[in-house]
Amino acid sequence: MLKNIFNIQTETDFQQKCLETFRYQYENLEVYRKFVDYLNINPSEINEVEKIPFLPIEMFKNHLVLDKNSKAEDYFQSSGTTQMNRSKHYISDFGLYEESIYKSFEQFIGKPEDYIFLGLLPSYSENPHSSLIYMVDFLIEKSGKPENGYFLYNHQELFELLQNLKDKKVILFGVSFALLDFLDFCQSNSQTLKLSNSLTIIETGGMKGRKEEMTKDELLKILQNGFGTEKIYSEYSMTELLSQAYSLGENIYETPNWMRVLVRNTEDPFSYVENGKTGAINIIDLANIHSCSFIATQDLGKILSNFEVPRFGRNDNKQILNNKFQVLGRIDHSDIRGCSLLVV
């Protein structure tokens, strides 16, 4: 049951795997079982995904979210100051996270071995338990290119390297405020970016209080103009997840095959809104088998459409339901985190 989540082939497979995971986590994850029991829900009556209870993400701040059959190797910790009550996600199998990273990247962008990876991720680089840094480190390792590396505030060095790599396939992972700082540096020093179409910029994170907040669309437009590219990609994940959704432009995200977004009603957390309506994001992440695969986040968003996509690695015509969604901001009064956005 714990294996083969990356080989889900049909919508029936996905639904069955979700229900199996729910039953396993109810039986073996103490904090989740107590939550379900508190809601007075009979687990035997959960026979469809929409009925599965989603654990509030805040539980990762004050509880051990790890099943009783697992032993933690280490943990990821959310961004923030040392005075803040930060989330901890205890990890018992880093191989599961690495496979999720690889297959998700491969599905949406390509094989990591084909790219040079550069990281412009200050603040995250200073967090020894950052899941984002672990992800980029893993992609760098798989790439194996000598040009791979991180940049904190050495903008001139990054500028020169980007010019020298114009003929190479390059991925630049950048936290939002750092990408804006880099563009400010180029402008103030009259440095003109001459980049090739082989550069892919993947924006992630947020302003972290370093810049004036703006809408996602405003941010993407500034980055598009500054870097002279038609599309800015984005990555959406969080400390409490082992999977990532990607946007290939226009602030429209897609989930990998073992991950799904549902949008709940902010007035009634046990019901869901229609596609196109704004609500709070619930996330199914089947890679979280040893923690919790059903998480109610404090992010606002909306599902744009449901669609069928072919499974990679298969020659048949079987399809699986997936969704495109937008992330629109944070619920009022929720904690301000490094990945916060202004509601649009």
Segments from the language model and where they lie:
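Active-site glycine/GP-rich loop and adjacent strand/helix microenvironment
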Residues: 2-5, 9-24, 28-31, 114, ...
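Ser/Thr-glycine-rich phosphate-binding loops at phosphate-binding pockets of nucleotides
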Residues: 75-85, 123, 176, 239-241
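Short acidic, glycine/Ser/Thr-rich loop/turn "cap" segments at secondary-structure junctions
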Residues: 83-91, 113-123, 144-148, 273-274
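Short, conserved acidic/polar surface loops in the N-terminal third of protein domains
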Residues: 86-90, 128-131, 182-185
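Short capping loops/turns at secondary-structure boundaries
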Residues: 90, 94, 98, 121-129, ...
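Conserved AMP-binding loop of ANL adenylate-forming enzymes
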Residues: 108-136
